[in-house]
Design a protein with these regions (language model features):
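Membrane-embedded, hydrophobic transmembrane alpha-helices
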Residues: 1-188, 702-703
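Hydrophobic, aromatic-rich transmembrane alpha-helices
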Residues: 52-63, 284-295, 493-544
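Signature aromatic-anchored transmembrane alpha helix within multi-pass, membrane-resident enzymes
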Residues: 198-204, 308-315, 361-369, 384-388, ...
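Active-site lumenal/periplasmic loops and adjacent helix-entry segments of GT-C-fold
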Residues: 208-299, 304-309, 313, 317, ...
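Membrane-proximal, lumen/periplasm-facing interface regions of secretory-pathway glyco-
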Residues: 221-225, 230-232, 608-654
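Hydrophobic/aromatic-rich transmembrane helices and adjacent perimembrane loops
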Residues: 235, 337-343, 373-376, 381-383, ...
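Membrane-lumen/periplasm interface segments of specific transmembrane helices
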Residues: 397, 425-505
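Short periplasmic/luminal acceptor-recognition loop of GT-C membrane glycosyltransferases, typified by
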Residues: 641-686, 712-719
Length: 759
């Protein structure tokens, strides 16, 4: 053994973690607003409230004897907290919606499940969610193809679908047609015993507190990207007839694969964003569940005729994932990262189950989930390709090794071959992801001429495949998304920013893995070496697969870190999850306490960073409801109007509303009108990254765009025009030639009416 005593290892890691945490803290304090955020009264209140929650959970877990009473008390306390912060109704509605999608998947797979059923109940639920989500997305796309998908139809259809699915599922359960349980045996014993492992009650209490913290600030964590496109699907995704309508958007972000936005169309309201954010949060819970189950599945073993389920290590893995800001901060954003991560983890979970039991249908489910990830995020192909490559490499190695070493009788081979041939009907499952990919990417193709944009646009242009107006104007193409380009990249400095100190770049700071992941990487390398040399006689197929997977994802992450201009931590959340999973798989159950002790400084540092960071940059928790105005959910629309007293954009909002919410081009950096859910197109989208500056190169091009987009009014802000000469010149030229007239003037803001008849 390389290290005589594990105690020395954990003491060394504790000291290393403490030093690196203090260093990172000092660097954050000197380069960011970290210390100022910590001193803010709202942050202090957050810490006080959650310290009380943490103590309450610890007392319940340690002093209440009956498990059912523990559960009731925790649920009651959580519901009280959620009601205070106005997220209970939105969360419950989303839980019902996600459960309905899971039930829909179960109903669609009912015939298949008569022959094939997952050994893991959690995996079965997650596979159901994948199939149910794909089916819903396909149905909305088909309604759009037949020009039937107005917002009213989508909401009525979704409501009817949820009610019908729940009623049919309950009816089939009463008739005992659907399987009532998984194949997980009844004779299970669990490694976690709160009486013996009292320190685990602290882990559970911290996990619950952190998860509630995210819900407590969910309503106020309204980030720029979510407002820009996540919450505005009713105006930038769904037209009068469906998702394939031309809505006058000019930026790559509006033509990305919109799987998540389609999935949440029915949850989209003008009054509150809580419903969409709660869906992301539920997806984050499913992601944590996938991490938990992956450790469970990978460490299953029989002891004296009983199945040992190592839920202690699984719970630690869930805990580490829940306190990593880069991962869990995605739970309160309308960004697509968390659902993409969920699909990738479901794929990996199915592969782990295949390696455990050697049943072909797990490979099919794994491929279904992996392909599903492509419809949610444009950068998913990079990391999903790495996951797919790892699976292919492992299967090829397995096939070659079996062919070389296997000397079993022919009968057994024949039986296995028959089972494999019988399993080929599972390939029909590929209909769901492939159809969804075609229908979702069809929107991008119809609107742009490319099947996928973002970082891939330059490839199509080099192949001679052009885009439609306004993504191509004359000979000028859309700018696409910035890569690092020819700029020399200092990888060591980027790694330093990502894992130790983000310096002054706030976008890294709010999605930081913190030094916790750095310590876990060091520990993972040590344990991988120990496991490799101490377990020569054990079954190590799963270990081999996870190592291949880890190398593949690490390579993809390094490539992304090198190529991508902006190194947000959320790009690498799959890598972070795999680090956590691998560490928790490689340690022994008896070493869990040592692991938690060694990482204590990093754990508290990660929780501290998490408490003051989110994509919106807000501090504190959602305020209490306004009596007589808010009934169970947060009214973002009215709350925003309340903050605009004396602001010109408040009057602009009322005037545009009186006009019937005409499509308006906004020349301002203020996103108030976007927040208030008006039909707005933004000038910065046209000329910025992902847009096409050629639209404003000539006045004729700009007029052509206004006509194409159906722009009826232009709203300008004086300060913005003073900083953007071209925007100012365009307004002046159009006023001179009579194609624009002033409709209303305020202190710093003006509304102009576009006279399209003059074009």
């Amino acid at each position: 053994m390389f290290i005589k005593s594990k105690r020395y290892l954990y003491v060394s890691l504790f000291v290393f973690g403490l030093i690196i945490s203090l260093y990172s803290l000092v660097m954050l304090g000197s380069n960011t607003y970290f210390f100022g955020d910590l001193k803010d009264p709202m942050t202090i209140r957050l810490f006080a409230e959650h310290f009380l929650l943490f103590i309450s959970f610890c007392l319940i877990l340690n002093f209440v004897k009956k498990n059912n009473i523990k559960l009731y008390l925790i649920v009651f306390l959580s519901m009280l907290y959620l009601s205070l912060h106005q997220v209970l109704i939105a969360l419950m509605l989303n839980i019902v919606y996600v459960v309905a999608l899971i039930m829909l998947g179960e109903l669609l797979l009912i015939k298949l499940r008569a022959e094939y059923i997952e050994e893991s109940y959690v995996c079965r639920l997650l596979n159901n969610f994948v199939i149910g989500s794909l089916s819903y997305i396909i149905s909305i796309c088909l309604l759009s193809a037949f020009k039937l998908a107005s917002i009213r139809v989508v909401k009525l259809y979704s409501f009817g679908l949820v009610i019908s699915v729940i009623l049919i599922y309950v009816w089939l359960r009463m008739l005992k047609i659907t399987p009532l349980r998984s194949l997980r045996p009844d004779n299970c014993i669990y490694s976690l015993d709160f009486k013996k492992d009292k320190y685990m009650s602290v882990v559970v209490a911290l996990t619950l507190s952190v998860l509630l913290l995210q819900l407590g600030r969910l309503n106020i964590a309204i980030d720029y990207d979510s407002v820009r496109y996540g919450f505005r699907s009713l105006f930038v995704l769904l037209g009068d007839f469906g998702i394939y309508d031309t809505l006058g958007t000019v930026n790559d972000v509006y033509v990305y694969p919109k799987g998540l936005e389609i999935l949440t169309l029915a949850l989209n309201t003008r009054g509150s964003f809580s419903f969409i954010l709660s869906f992301s949060y539920v997806c984050a819970l499913l992601t944590l569940l996938a991490v938990y189950e992956m450790v469970i599945v990978s460490r299953l073993k029989k002891v004296e005729g009983k199945v040992l389920i190592d839920n202690k290590r699984a719970l630690v893995a869930l805990f580490f994932a829940a306190i990593t800001p880069a991962i869990i901060n995605m739970a309160i954003s309308a960004k697509t990262d968390i659902i993409t991560l969920l699909m990738q983890l479901i794929s990996i979970l199915n592969m782990c189950l295949y390696i455990r039991v050697r049943k072909l249908y797990y490979i099919v489910f794994s491929l279904v989930s992996l392909l599903s990830s492509l419809i949610y995020k444009p950068t998913a192909p990079l990391f999903s390709f790495a996951v797919g490559c790892a699976a292919v490499i492992y299967l090829c190695l397995e096939f070659c090794l079996k062919k070389y070493y296997k000397k079993e009788n022919v009968k057994k081979e024949n039986i296995e071959n028959k089972k494999s041939k019988k399993s080929f009907k599972l390939i029909a499952l590929m209909f769901y992801p492939l159809t969804a990919i075609v229908l979702v990417f069809a929107r991008t193709y119809i609107l742009t001429g490319h099947i996928i944009t973002s970082v891939y646009s330059s490839i199509w242009y080099k192949l001679g495949i052009g885009t439609h107006f306004p993504y191509t104007v004359d000979e000028y193409n859309s700018a696409g998304v910035n890569l690092a380009g020819d700029v020399k990249v200092d990888m060591a400095y980027r790694l330093y920013q990502l894992f130790i100190a983000p310096t002054k770049e706030e976008h890294i700071y709010i999605a930081s893995p913190t030094v916790l992941l750095l310590v876990l990487i060091v520990l993972g390398i040590i344990y991988a070496i120990i496991y490799r040399y101490e377990n020569k006689d054990r079954e190590r197929s799963l270990y081999k697969y996870l190592m291949i997977l880890f190398i593949a994802v690490t390579t993809a992450s390094a490539l992304g870190l090198y190529m991508i201009h902006q190194i947000d931590g959320n790009y690498f959340i799959l890598f972070f999850c795999l680090v956590i999973i691998n560490v928790c798989l490689l340690i022994e159950s008896d070493d869990v306490k040592g692991l938690l002790t060694a990482t204590t400084p990093c754990i508290f540092f990660a929780i501290t960073v998490l408490s003051v960071t989110n994509w919106a940059g807000v501090k504190g928790l959602t305020p209490a409801p306004i009596a007589g105005r808010e009934f169970g959910f947060y009214n973002h629309h009215d709350r925003k109007l309340d903050t605009l007293e004396g602001n010109d954009f408040r009057e602009v909002y009322y005037d545009l509303t009186k006009l019937g919410d005409p499509r308006t081009l906004l020349m301002s950096d203020d996103n108030t009108l976007l927040h208030l859910c008006l039909d707005i197109r933004v000038y910065a989208d046209v000329v910025g990254s992902g847009g096409n500056v050629a639209i404003v190169k000539t006045l004729d091009n700009f007029k052509r765009y206004l006509k194409f987009a159906g722009i009826e009014y232009i709203c300008t802000e004086e300060n913005y025009l003073a900083e953007h000469d071209r925007a100012k010149n365009i307004i002046e030229f159009m006023l001179e030639d009579g194609s624009l007239e002033e409709y209303k003037s305020y202190k710093d803001v003006r509304i102009y009416r576009v006279k399209a008849e003059q074009f």
